[in-house]
């Protein structure tokens, strides 16, 4: 798991070969020009989804992991929390779905990560995470970039 500002994402280009493509896309497009909905960047290797919602989750309601992709959760407006935990703190509630690349769990929160505008959380397959944990009553605008691991 990596917690950083979007302005420092370039620091992590060696982590995944698709990060350089994402940085190039963001430099050419600009965060302020992202519109709601799906974002096609590089086929099934790198794509995103931009959306606005009221964070309504209670920490620990569920956790998720992915096997084929990592997530970059980037808050564009307002703030939200992400609950994170370790494998020994959860039990599986939905077995891994290969088509959707998700496995769901319930369990105990280990930490809350507070994300503000311009900050992002990068989650890897071993990182159990729960997005959309409410901080306040204002809408959150966020983009989640989905990045192929290999």
Where are these regions (language model features)?
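Surface/interface-facing alpha-helical segments and adjacent flexible terminal/loop regions used
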Residues: 1-35, 40-42
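Conserved metal-binding segment of the jelly-roll/cupin
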Residues: 114-132
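Glycine- and acidic-residue-biased ligand/ion/polar-headgroup-sensing regions
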Residues: 68-70, 74-84, 88-89, 96-102
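A short hydrophobic beta-strand segment most commonly corresponding to one strand
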Residues: 72, 120-122, 137-150
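A short glycine-rich, His/Asp/Glu-containing loop-to-beta-strand
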Residues: 38-57, 68-77
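An anionic, turn-rich surface loop/hairpin at beta-sheet edges
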Residues: 93-113
């Amino acid at each position: 798991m990596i917690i950083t500002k979007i302005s420092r994402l370039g620091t992590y280009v060696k982590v995944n070969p698709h990060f350089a493509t994402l940085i190039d896309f963001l430099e050419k497009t600009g965060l302020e020009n992202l519109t709601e909905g799906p974002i096609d960047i590089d086929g099934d290797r790198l794509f995103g989804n931009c959306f606005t919602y009221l964070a309504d989750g209670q920490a620990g309601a569920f956790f998720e992991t992915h096997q084929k992709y990592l997530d970059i959760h980037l808050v564009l407006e307002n703030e939200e929390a992400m609950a994170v935990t370790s494998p020994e703190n959860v039990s599986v509630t939905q077995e891994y779905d290969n088509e959707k690349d998700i496995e769901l769990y319930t369990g105990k929160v280990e930490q809350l990560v507070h994300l503000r505008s311009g900050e992002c959380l990068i989650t890897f397959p071993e990182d159990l995470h729960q997005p959309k944990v409410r901080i306040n009553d204002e809408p959150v605008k966020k983009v989640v970039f989905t990045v192929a691991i290999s």
